Structure formats: structure tokens, C-alpha cells
């Protein structure tokens, strides 16, 4: 599989010039979008992207062999670079092709269920790709030449690249393939976004020999990890709490609440501080999970599938809004794939509510007269860490799903008859995995 990573390098100066360059590029994309919409019947005859780009150029670009064109691009965009022109055509083709597909699906759907008609494609906030030799030349370690619109023409200018950004890329991406950079604007600053690609081959390991890291992401603690095998054995446990970071986040949120009580003004500075602390928690959590997976040499990281759709209710809804669980999972997936580790998700229902020994529903916190909500009591009277109990159930559900996949349909029905809770994945626990292994061994 191919992995892509984007690193940004800040440029110094030339902000007004970059603004004009991007404005002209967006106008060119809008021009080609109108042409593609008008001549789509002809353009769609091309099967490949290159064929369609050539068809659009034959309609818009005057040459010695094609002096008369119905849509003269050069009349409105004098000396527009050919590399940038083809990039604008490709961008417009993608937008119009997507619109035509959506329109066909809308027309084929039932009138009562198809909803509103797809809107015409818009240019949007697109940015130009700086193709090498034509738009971008690296003149030094911390300097590059880019072709921009300056003094009413397209010319080369030298831009300085921030040293810390370049050094970071040289340190982390020396062995990766560097792709074409893209000019991007974030806030009031301009960056060159460099995309790096590498090919990774994930190992194929049988489910019997697979070692996993089951991860439970929590609201009270950052994460709880358990290293497990297919027999249900737990080889290791790791905890990450980050109490200082969570205290800082609570302190920042309380500042926001106090400011909102005093006046109705917006507080972007306070929200920026809280967001920065929250992002720091997410980054440290993702790094801890991947480092633990490498430490125990696991083949797969298993997490819950978290669905945040719908309105959040209850006294903890603000904490749910601030919870960066999906951000953590996306970072873990990127980091794990770079280290040839697979990532899987399982059903999250009842992972914390059911005891891993199969005794039934657990009671947490005040419900069981316990001092902390992170502790729970099983129906048998055993007191246990609730997040650790959930991580056992998460890992067990992954093994149950993968083991049942390897069985023929009839054999799977026989095993499900012996272990009835396997029919409902939301009721599976560690005891279900042990029973499944016993049924397979019988």
C-alpha cells in the first residue's frame, strides 16, 4: 500500500504576489469548468484523464495547427504557464465529472427520495501545484525559485524557506519520494506543502499467530492498552493518564466559562489555548499507543468504532465535544502503517458495561459505592479497572470476528449454537473468546 505524508514549509515575503497568483489560477479553473460543462458530451468521449485534457486544450488553446478555437484561453490569460494551465484543466475536469455522476444518480433515483438537484460545480478554495522545472526550482537548501504573476507577467522570484521546516523534512523524509509541492495559505501566512510517498507492505499473519494491542480511549484517562493473543491470554497492560494535561484543559475551559458569564463577547484566545492543550493530549496519546505496539511487537492495533452522530446530551456533553478520539485514531492509523502494523475497529457497544468474565453487567463509580468512576464492580463482587475490562472485551471481539471468518458457514452455525452470545457481537466478552476456542478445539 502507498502512504502519503504532507509537510509544510513556510515562505517569507511575497504575500501580495502569491495572492494575485492564486486569484488568477482560480479564474482559470472557473473558465475551464464553464467549458467542460458546455462541451461535456465531447469531452466525456475521452476514457483517460490525459485524453480529456487534450480535448479541452483543443477547444481552448490556439496553436499553429489549431489557430481557431471556440473558447480562446490566451485572450483572457496572457502568457499563462502551460504546467499551471494543465493543472487547472485537471481540477476542472474532476469537479465537472463528479457533478455529472451526481446528476446521473439523482435522475435515476425515485423522485420522492432523491432530494434536491445537485448544484453546479464551483471553483472553491483551490491552490496551484508548483510543478518542477516549470513552476518550482530548488536553488539552495533554504531557498527556492517559484514562477508567479508579478509586474503584469509570469516571472521567477526567489523565496526563502524557513530553516526549521526544511531541517525537519530532511530528518524525517530523507528516504521518501518527494512529490510536487502545492502553494497554500493558512491564515495570513503562505506555505509550500510537500507531499512524500512511500510503499509499505503489511505482513500477512494467520489469526492464530496474530498478537494484538487492544486500546480503550477514555474520557477520564487518555488510554488503556492490553496486549493479547488469540487464546485470550493477556501478555501486557499499559496505562496513560496525563493528569497534568487534563488539569490544564479543565483550567482553560473554566476560564472560557467564566469569561462567557461576564460578557457575550467571543474569546478566541482562550479557545485557542484550550484547543492547543487538547491537541497536545491527542498527539501524546497516539504516540504512546504506537510506541507500545512497537515495544510488544504486535501485528494489529484494535480500537473501538466510535460514532459521534447526533446531538450530545447530558452533563458531560462539553467533554464529549472536546474529546479528540477520532483524531487520535487517524494519527494512530498513519503511524501504525508506517511501522507495518495493521489497524482494526470493532463494535463499541457494551465494552465497558459487560464484565470480561461473562458474569453480566458491571456497576461503576457511585452506583457501586466506589470512590472513582474508573473503577467497577462485577456481579461476582470483584472490583476491577473499568477501562482495562473494556480493553479485554475490545481485543476479544476482534479475535471472535476474525476466527468466525475462517470457518465455513455450517461450521460457524454449529459453533454459534454452542456459544449463543457469538450471534450478537455487542454481547461478546473475553469469556466468549475462551468458549469459542474451547468449541473449536472440541
Task: List each model region and its residues.
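Nucleic-acid substrate recognition interfaces
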Residues: 1-442
Amino acid at each position: 500500500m502507498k502512504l502519503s505524508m504532507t509537510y509544510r514549509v513556510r515562505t517569507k515575503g511575497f504575500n501580495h504576489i502569491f495572492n494575485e497568483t492564486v486569484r488568477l489560477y482560480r479564474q482559470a479553473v472557473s473558465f475551464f469548468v464553464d467549458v467542460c460543462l458546455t462541451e461535456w458530451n465531447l469531452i466525456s468521449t475521452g476514457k483517460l484523464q490525459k485524453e480529456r485534457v487534450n480535448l479541452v486544450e483543443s477547444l481552448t488553446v490556439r496553436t499553429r495547427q489549431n489557430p481557431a478555437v471556440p473558447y480562446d484561453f490566451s485572450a483572457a490569460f496572457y502568457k499563462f504557464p502551460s504546467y499551471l494551465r494543465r493543472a487547472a484543466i485537471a481540477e476542472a475536469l474532476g469537479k465537472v465529472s463528479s457533478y455529472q455522476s451526481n446528476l446521473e444518480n439523482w435522475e435515476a433515483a425515485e423522485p420522492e427520495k432523491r432530494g434536491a438537484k445537485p448544484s453546479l460545480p464551483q471553483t472553491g478554495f483551490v491552490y496551484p501545484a508548483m510543478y518542477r522545472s516549470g513552476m518550482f526550482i530548488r536553488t539552495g537548501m533554504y531557498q527556492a525559485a517559484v514562477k508567479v504573476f508579478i509586474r503584469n507577467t509570469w516571472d521567477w522570484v526567489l523565496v526563502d524557506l524557513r530553516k526549521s521546516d526544511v531541517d525537519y523534512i530532511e530528518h524525517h523524509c530523507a528516504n521518501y519520494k518527494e512529490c510536487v509541492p502545492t502553494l497554500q495559505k493558512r491564515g495570513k501566512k503562505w506555505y509550500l506543502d510537500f507531499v512524500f510517498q512511500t510503499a509499505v507492505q503489511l505482513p500477512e499473519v494467520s489469526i492464530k499467530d496474530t498478537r494484538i494491542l487492544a486500546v480503550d480511549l477514555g474520557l477520564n484517562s487518555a488510554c488503556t492498552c492490553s496486549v493479547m493473543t488469540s487464546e485470550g491470554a493477556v501478555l501486557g497492560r499499559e496505562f496513560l493518564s496525563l493528569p497534568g494535561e487534563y488539569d490544564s484543559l479543565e483550567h482553560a475551559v473554566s476560564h472560557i466559562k467564566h469569561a462567557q458569564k461576564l460578557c457575550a463577547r467571543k474569546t478566541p484566545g482562550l479557545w485557542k489555548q484550550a484547543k492547543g492543550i487538547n491537541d497536545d493530549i491527542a498527539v501524546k496519546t497516539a504516540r504512546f499507543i504506537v510506541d507500545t505496539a512497537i515495544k510488544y511487537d504486535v501485528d494489529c492495533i484494535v480500537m473501538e468504532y466510535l460514532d459521534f452522530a447526533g446531538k450530545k446530551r447530558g452533563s458531560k456533553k462539553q467533554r464529549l465535544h472536546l474529546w479528540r478520539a477520532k483524531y487520535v485514531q487517524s494519527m494512530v492509523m498513519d503511524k501504525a502503517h508506517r511501522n507495518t502494523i495493521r489497524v482494526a475497529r470493532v463494535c463499541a457497544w457494551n465494552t465497558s458495561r459487560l464484565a470480561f468474565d461473562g458474569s453480566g453487567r458491571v456497576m461503576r463509580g457511585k452506583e457501586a459505592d466506589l470512590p472513582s468512576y474508573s473503577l467497577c464492580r462485577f456481579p461476582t463482587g470483584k472490583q476491577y479497572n473499568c477501562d482495562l475490562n473494556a480493553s479485554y472485551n475490545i481485543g476479544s471481539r476482534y479475535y471472535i470476528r476474525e476466527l468466525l471468518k475462517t470457518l465455513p458457514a455450517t461450521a460457524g452455525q454449529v459453533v454459534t449454537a454452542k456459544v449463543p452470545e457469538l450471534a450478537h457481537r455487542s454481547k461478546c466478552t473475553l469469556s466468549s473468546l475462551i468458549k469459542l476456542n474451547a468449541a473449536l478445539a472440541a
